[in-house]
């Protein structure tokens, strides 16, 4: 017989996922109304890197339609992040200390802000460097010209944006792992070399196989890992304070 509390947790999880999914769908529908303008903005780094006479193309008749659908889904995800993070918080909140529950709004704002900052950093600073390098590398031989598919470009862009967004979530993740007692700043400091290796592995998996793209992911990862050590130290202190307050209340 399935425990009643497990059924309640699963029902709560289903409800939270439905709300988060509904917010994502609504965001995607709103963004689809502006999908062509969004694609012009998203493709700007590549179009600026293309040599004269080259342009984005579509290979299949349905490619523009599905490209705009995928772009709307990605933009809708970014737009609905505050709702998604709020639902995540609402699901885990019953197991937290009263003092930790007060972190709801900071968690939602910080998580959404960090993901947005990562996407903004990738798009504004890394995309121009990466696509300029890739296009110049591919066209350095005189008889080769660039003719890039809009669908392939968007797929690569989405992977990069998600990668930068997730990497910038590292301090938030470490903060809560510290609050739960899973890691501490001493443990993180002892594993700097492992983190450096992991940074390049993540860069190799999520980016094109060129050194510029991999360094663009690995560099922020290493910097944010050092930031996470400081965050872990602060999180450990606050966790001890919260535990003391809970014991005093009892």
Swiss-Prot record:
Keywords assigned: Cell inner membrane, Cell membrane, Membrane, Protein transport, Translocation, Transmembrane, Transmembrane helix, Transport
Membrane topology label: Multi-pass membrane protein
Lineage top rank: taxon: Bacteria
GO biological process: intracellular protein transmembrane transport; protein transport by the Tat complex
Transmembrane segments: 19-39, 73-93, 107-127, 133-153, 160-180, 211-231
GO cellular component: TAT protein transport complex
Keyword Cell membrane tagged: yes
Annotated localization: Cell inner membrane
InterPro entries: TatC
Subunit structure: The Tat system comprises two distinct complexes: a TatABC complex, containing multiple copies of TatA, TatB and TatC subunits, and a separate TatA complex, containing only TatA subunits. Substrates initially bind to the TatABC complex, which probably triggers association of the separate TatA complex to form the active translocon.
UniProt similarity note: Belongs to the TatC family.
Free-text function comment from the UniProt entry: Part of the twin-arginine translocation (Tat) system that transports large folded proteins containing a characteristic twin-arginine motif in their signal peptide across membranes. Together with TatB, TatC is part of a receptor directly interacting with Tat signal peptides.
NCBIfam families noted in UniProt: tatC
PANTHER family tied to this protein: SEC-INDEPENDENT PROTEIN TRANSLOCASE PROTEIN TATC, SEC-INDEPENDENT PROTEIN TRANSLOCASE PROTEIN TATC, CHLOROPLASTIC-RELATED
Protein name (database record): Sec-independent protein translocase protein TatC
Gene name for this UniProt entry: tatC
């Amino acid at each position: 017989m399935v425990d009643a509390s497990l059924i309640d947790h699963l029902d709560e999880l289903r409800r939270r996922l439905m709300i988060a999914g509904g917010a994502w769908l609504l965001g995607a529908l709103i963004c689809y109304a502006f999908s062509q303008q969004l694609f012009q903005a998203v493709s700007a780094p590549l179009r600026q890197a293309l040599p004269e006479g080259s342009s984005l193309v579509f290979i299949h008749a349905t490619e523009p339609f599905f490209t705009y659908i995928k772009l709307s889904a990605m933009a809708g995800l970014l737009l609905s992040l505050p709702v998604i993070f709020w639902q995540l918080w609402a699901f885990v909140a019953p197991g937290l200390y009263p003092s930790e529950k007060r972190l709801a709004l900071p968690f939602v704002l910080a998580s959404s802000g960090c993901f947005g900052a990562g996407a903004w950093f990738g798009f504004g600073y890394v995309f121009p460097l990466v696509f300029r390098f890739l296009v110049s590398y591919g066209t350095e031989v005189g008889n080769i010209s660039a003719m890039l598919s809009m669908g392939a470009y968007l797929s690569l862009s989405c992977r990069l944006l998600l990668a930068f967004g997730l990497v910038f979530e590292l301090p938030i993740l470490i903060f809560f792992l510290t609050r739960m007692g899973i890691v501490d700043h001493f443990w993180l400091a002892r594993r700097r070399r492992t983190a450096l290796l992991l940074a390049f592995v993540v860069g190799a998996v999520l980016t094109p196989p060129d050194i510029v793209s991999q360094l663009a992911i690995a560099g922020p990862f290493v910097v944010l890992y050092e930031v996470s050590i400081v965050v872990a130290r602060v999180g450990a202190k606050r966790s001890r304070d919260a535990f003391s307050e809970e014991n005093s209340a009892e």
